[in-house]
Amino acid sequence: MYDIKKWRHIFKLDSAKHISDDDLDAICMSQTDAIMIGGTDDVTEDNVIHLMSRVRRYPLPLVLEISNIESVMPGFDFYFVPTVLNSTDVAFHNGTLLEALKTYGHSIDFEEVIFEGYVVCNADSKVAKHTKANTDLTTEDLEAYAQMVNHMYRLPVMYIEYSGIYGDVSKVQAVSEHLTETQLFYGGGISSEQQATEMAAIADTIIVGDIIYKDIKKALKTVKIKESSK
């Protein structure tokens, strides 16, 4: 079993987006710690299994971040289950999880399931609109969510998600200072080695996604953060 606590860098692939064989090879051979397959819309069983079969040729951990029950399938090393803490819709807190457990609970290996305390911060993002997230958050709000995740819910991961834009470094820093046990994931807008380095100095793990589809060379440079330690 892989130890996610050791992961500093994850490439996140969108199952609904095209990626060439050459670019996928470069991503999977880049020394990233893991590949995560996710997405917000058009996530289907067919496109997830197609992308999974392409990535499975490479010897690195493969994660499915669950966005709907229909696309869940065996074959992944981990299943990351988001609970969107700032969503106004209970379905994104535990409703989807409830349905998944009713359907698959008898066959789940819970050692493979990682619960993520998500906080969505970009009001204009697809994920914010889809999850009906309240993104008007102060630093104090984020600190309270961090305490909730770390001390009360005791979740293994807190994911600060800016999805499409580069986040407020001071707010991410404030969250980090309140997490003593929970692993901090940061994702959103990382499009350069400099940004990757800046966020990797604060978060335990950075998630790099959109830039893969815009500029593969810039995406690959973000892996250089592994050459330094937090």
Swiss-Prot record:
GO BP annotations listed: glycerophospholipid biosynthetic process
Domain of life of the source: Bacteria
Gene3D superfamilies per the UniProt record, alphabetical: FMN-linked oxidoreductases
Keyword S-adenosyl-L-methionine appears in the UniProt entry: no
Names of the cofactor(s): Mg(2+)
Key words, A-Z: Lipid biosynthesis, Lipid metabolism, Magnesium, Metal-binding, Phospholipid biosynthesis, Phospholipid metabolism, Transferase
InterPro entries linked to this entry: GGGP/HepGP_synthase_I, GGGP/HepGP_synthase_sf, GGGP_HepGP_synthase
Pathway assigned to this chain's UniProt record: Membrane lipid metabolism; glycerophospholipid metabolism
EC number: 2.5.1.n9
Catalytic EC class: transferase
Residues reported in the UniProt entry to bind sn-glycerol 1-phosphate: 12, 159-164, 189, 209-210
Recorded catalytic activity of this chain's protein: sn-glycerol 1-phosphate + all-trans-heptaprenyl diphosphate = 3-heptaprenyl-sn-glycero-1-phosphate + diphosphate
Binding-site positions, Mg(2+): 14, 40
Gene Ontology molecular function terms on file: heptaprenylglyceryl phosphate synthase activity; magnesium ion binding
Subunit record text: Homodimer.
PANTHER family: HEPTAPRENYLGLYCERYL PHOSPHATE SYNTHASE, PTHR40029
The protein's role, per its UniProt record: Prenyltransferase that catalyzes in vivo the transfer of the heptaprenyl moiety of heptaprenyl pyrophosphate (HepPP; 35 carbon atoms) to the C3 hydroxyl of sn-glycerol-1-phosphate (G1P), producing heptaprenylglyceryl phosphate (HepGP). This reaction is an ether-bond-formation step in the biosynthesis of archaea-type G1P-based membrane lipids found in Bacillales.
HAMAP family: GGGP_HepGP_synthase
Similarity annotation: Belongs to the GGGP/HepGP synthase family. Group I subfamily.
Protein name according to UniProt: Heptaprenylglyceryl phosphate synthase
Annotated source species: Staphylococcus aureus (strain bovine RF122 / ET3-1)
Gene assigned in the entry: pcrB
